[in-house]
Amino acid sequence: MVCKGCGTNCQCSAQKCGDNCACNKDCQCVCKNGPKDQCCSNK
């Protein structure tokens, strides 16, 4: 599952996950632009 909230505009602070990571707690997904907390939302 990819980060749906911001599509390809997602990055993960955990290096092992890379960009457009799965929405995993270990990946700490955030949006590069816009509301960071919406990266892993289902909207």
From Swiss-Prot:
GO terms, biological process: cellular detoxification of metal ion; response to metal ion
Pfam family, one: Metallothio_5
A GO MF term: copper ion binding
Domain of life from the UniProt record: Eukaryota
Protein's job: This protein binds cations of several transition elements. Thought to be involved in metal ion homeostasis.
The family this protein is said to belong to: Belongs to the metallothionein superfamily. Type 5 family.
Protein name as catalogued: Metallothionein-2
Taxonomic lineage of the native organism: Eukaryota, Metazoa, Ecdysozoa, Arthropoda, Hexapoda
